[in-house]
Structure formats: structure tokens, C-alpha cells
A protein has these predicted regions:
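Active-site-proximal, Lys/Arg-enriched surface segment
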Residues: 14
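Acidic/polar-rich alpha-helix caps and helix-coil junctions
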Residues: 1, 6, 18-200
């Protein structure tokens, strides 16, 4: 059993309620994560067990996912947001929001409360919202690293720990860090002596 613990930063991106029985808000928290108070970490920790069907199916292979319709909506929305940022044309903003709202309206608890559409006017705010929505939707599916590369390889720090009581390890990728580049597989280097390994 190999659980992953989502960061507080990620969980804070979801608009959900664990106490309001009439409106749970963003249902992805319930569909994607397992709420476990029995793990040897802090109480009531959200965890993801990909191999047991939480977040992404019952695959024993992490990040072994096909393309989902949600990803296609997000990919197209990203193009529209970037075009809106580049040109300032409101039509691209409208198209981006249409894709984002189409995705989101199917992720919220609408039994007693109608989904409220997002309407963001500022290009930079829309870009930020888009990135957060992609992170909410595609968490633990193997997209994040590639997304960060596409966003310009920003500086990133993560805290790692094995269990309570042990020292934490902080790993940092600097902006534009060479570790954002995958190494060329050894089999490819063996077959072509003219290839040079990526610097890491």
C-alpha cells in the first residue's frame, strides 16, 4: 500500500464542505481522495491510494491514465486563456470560461444549490485560476511536472517525510533547474553515440 498525502496547498484549492450535508461543494475531494484518521500522521489526513481505485482507477501503475474529456476541456481552455493574454480579445476569454465552467458544473454538488459560473475579467487572474483548476482536476495523474515545465519551470519546494517523528527533507528545484529536463534513456544513448546526455 503506497499512499500519497496531498499538500495542504492542494487541498486548499478545493471549495468543499465536510460538514454541510446539503451542499458538499466540490465533489472531487470525495471522489479523488480517501479521508483516513487511522494513519500514523496527523489526524483526519486526506490520502490518495492510486492502486486501490482512489483517484484514477484501479491500476497498479501510477500515472497510467488515458486522456480524459476533462483534460481536453482544460487543454482547449489553456489555449484560449493564452490567446486572451496575448491579444486581449474578449472572445477568447469567453471561450476559456465556457470550457472551465462546463467542466466545473459537473464537479459540484447541485442537489440543493445551483452551480455558480466563474466570470473572471482580468487575464492574469484567469491564467492563475486556470492553473489551479487544472491542478484540482488532474492531481496525481502525472501531469503536474509537465505542466510546471510548460509554465516556465518556476522554483518549487517540497517537504518530504516518512513518518511522524522523523526529520523532514526539503527538496527545491530552482527556476529553470536542469532537473526539469528528463534524462535521455541509456538504451537510446547506447544506440546513438552522437547523442549527448541532458545535463541535470
Amino acid at each position: 500500500m503506497n499512499p500519497f498525502t496531498p499538500s495542504d496547498e492542494l487541498m486548499d484549492l478545493y471549495d468543499f464542505s465536510a460538514t454541510d450535508a446539503n451542499n458538499h461543494g466540490d465533489l472531487r475531494v470525495y471522489a479523488y481522495y480517501y479521508w483516513n484518521m487511522y494513519l500514523n500522521w496527523s489526524p483526519f489526513e486526506y490520502v490518495a491510494f492510486p492502486e486501490y481505485g482512489y483517484k484514477g482507477g484501479r491500476s497498479l501503475s501510477y500515472a497510467a491514465h488515458g486522456i480524459r474529456t476533462a483534460e481536453l476541456y482544460l487543454n482547449r481552455a489553456e489555449v484560449y486563456v493564452r490567446k486572451f493574454m496575448e491579444t486581449g480579445e474578449g472572445n477568447f476569454r469567453t471561450l476559456a470560461l465556457a470550457d472551465l465552467n462546463k467542466l466545473r458544473e459537473n464537479r459540484y454538488d447541485t442537489r440543493t444549490t445551483a452551480y455558480e459560473e466563474v466570470d473572471i475579467k482580468d487575464a492574469d487572474e484567469l491564467w492563475q485560476f486556470y492553473q489551479e483548476e487544472r491542478r484540482r482536476e488532474l492531481s496525481f495523474e502525472g501531469h503536474r511536472w509537465f505542466d510546471l515545465r510548460r509554465y516556465g519551470m518556476p522554483e518549487l519546494s517540497h517537504v518530504y517525510f516518512v513518518k511522524t517523528g522523523e526529520a523532514e527533507t526539503i527538496t527545491t528545484l530552482r527556476e529553470g533547474d536542469p532537473r526539469y529536463v528528463l534524462p535521455i534513456p541509456q538504451v537510446a544513448l547506447d544506440r546513438n553515440p552522437y547523442l549527448e546526455q541532458n545535463k541535470r
